């Protein structure tokens, strides 16, 4: 998933996907020199007349098109073998009790999905929120699991037991507190799961006890608009547009000013912490630190070492 953090990043992504309207087709695969199914690679050989999207009047300049085509050629020269290998992989991995897919599945009848556009299985937004139920466990990524949690931000795997779906996307690369999740199946014949997680955040030791807060809000991508009420000591006091909740956030979490502003995932949740707990530091401010403990992100107002 791509998080729209800046106009430059968003424009670059749209331009990269401009050809063929962002569709993944056989012509796109052939243009990249790849073989095999599924056709999962966009054609980056762009036409200067291509539009950024259906609602935009901004055309690609000749310089932009030339730069993108040069980038495409360099990527293919450097990683052609890797891209061919990726294109040869199955879209769905099937076992007796599990189905593994990047985005999601409409149902378990894989035979009936033969010949469909694999992109729909790769980009399946809000898969768990679709309230589908399966007999086998579906393990999916793509949609960061913190987006399923409206009160407390947590990047640990999300197990929707009644639906038999496990979301494992920890937001690595698109969330400031993102992490890489590894799901472990100790016994594939049992409904028993473990996981390990890793991130690149610095580790600190908490020195003071802190009780967890009981009422909190988690501002997430897609619902990330806030009015900035004031700024103070590297923080901003904001009002979340959709809920009306007010909270302090690190000022650096504002990635686009405006009325309203757009902010990174944020929360007013205070983590329960004991002295000696190891936490991961997301952001430090004079008001406190945003840290992560066991995959859960929140504020810590004690001392860190």
Regions found by a protein language model. Give the residues of each.
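Active-site neighborhood of divalent metal-dependent phosphoester bond hydrolases
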Residues: 1-91
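Acidic, His/Gly-enriched loop-helix segments that form or flank divalent-metal centers
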Residues: 36, 62-166, 172-176, 193-199, ...
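A structural signal for short hydrophobic beta-strand segments in well-ordered beta-sheet cores
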Residues: 92-93, 183, 228
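Short acidic-glycine loop/turn motifs at beta-strand connectors
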Residues: 95-97, 161, 184-189, 242
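C-terminal functional module detector
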Residues: 178, 185-222
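Short, basic/aromatic beta-hairpin or loop at an interaction surface
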Residues: 196-207, 243-260
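SH3/SH3-like (including bacterial SH3b) beta-barrel domains
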Residues: 209-221, 257-285
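SH3/SH3-like beta-barrel superfamily modules
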Residues: 221-250, 274-305
């Amino acid at each position: 998933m791509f998080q729209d953090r800046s106009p430059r990043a968003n424009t670059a992504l749209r331009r990269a996907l401009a050809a063929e309207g962002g569709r993944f087709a056989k012509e796109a695969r052939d243009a990249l020199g790849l073989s095999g199914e599924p056709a999962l690679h966009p054609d980056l050989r762009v036409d200067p007349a291509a539009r950024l999207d259906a609602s935009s009047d901004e055309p690609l300049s000749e310089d932009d098109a030339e730069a993108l085509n040069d980038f495409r050629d360099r990527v293919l020269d450097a990683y052609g073998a890797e891209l061919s290998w990726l294109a040869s992989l199955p879209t769905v991995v099937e076992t007796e009790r599990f189905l593994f897919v990047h985005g999601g599945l409409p149902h378990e009848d894989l035979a009936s999905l033969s010949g469909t556009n694999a992109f729909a299985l790769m980009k399946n937004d809000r898969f768990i929120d679709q309230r589908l139920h399966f007999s086998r466990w579906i393990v999916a990524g793509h949609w960061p699991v913190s987006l399923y949690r409206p009160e407390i931000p947590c990047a640990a795997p999300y197990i929707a037991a009644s639906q038999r779906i496990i979301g494992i996307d920890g937001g690595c690369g698109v969330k400031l507190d993102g992490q890489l999740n590894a799901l472990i199946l100790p016994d594939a014949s049992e409904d028993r799961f473990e996981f390990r997680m890793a991130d690149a955040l610095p580790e600190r030791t908490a020195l003071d006890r802190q009780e967890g807060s009981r009422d909190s809000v988690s501002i997430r991508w897609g619902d990330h608009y806030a009015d900035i009420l004031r700024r103070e000591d590297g923080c901003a006091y904001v009002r979340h547009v959709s809920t009306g909740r007010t909270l302090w956030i690190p000022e650096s979490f504002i990635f686009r000013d405006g009325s309203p502003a757009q902010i990174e995932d944020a929360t007013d949740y205070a983590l329960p912490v004991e002295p000696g707990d190891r936490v991961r530091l997301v952001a430090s401010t004079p008001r406190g630190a945003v840290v992560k403990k066991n995959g859960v992100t929140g504020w810590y107002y004690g001392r860190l070492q």
